[in-house]
Amino acid sequence: MARRKLALTSLPGFERDVYALPDLRTQKMALDMLVLIRAGRVQGEPLGQHVKTGDLSDCYKFYFDPNGAGKPRYRLVYRYTPDEVEAIAIEAVAVGERSGLDVYLTAAERLGRR
């Protein structure tokens, strides 16, 4: 049985996050990562519930960097949105520089968990 192609959606504010990334190359990579996640070619790490960020246990984090050298500088937070039976979409929640907890805090706020 073929896997159904997931839709790509985003929460309000995600587009603003993308445009806030420092250059076109980084912006494109953030969007390309979502396409690769949807295709099942890459996968993020599950997030959890933490005192500082709230409950992000239905979300995943994925690190990326167009430079490809050293520690990735950017973080993408996304989640799968289900219907009654299975995931039907990948929902982009937040993206930004990998500094502190900023992206996680933005994600929690957009999900109404802060």
What are these regions (language model features)?
Residues 3, 57, 71-73:
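A general secondary-structure signal for short beta-strands and their flanking turns/coil
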Residues 1-5, 53, 114:
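An acidic, glycine-rich, mixed-charge low-complexity segment common to nucleic-acid enzymes
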Residues 27, 53-57, 110:
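Conserved functional hotspots at enzyme active or ligand-binding sites that engage polyanionic ligands
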Residues 1-36:
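Arg/Lys-rich, positively charged N-terminal/basic patches that mediate binding to nucleic acids
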Residues 38-68:
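A short, surface-exposed loop/turn module that caps and links secondary-structure elements
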Residues 5-7, 59, 89:
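A residue-level signal for beta-strand positions that form part of recognition/binding surfaces
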Residues 64-114:
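Enriched for short, Lys/Arg-rich terminal
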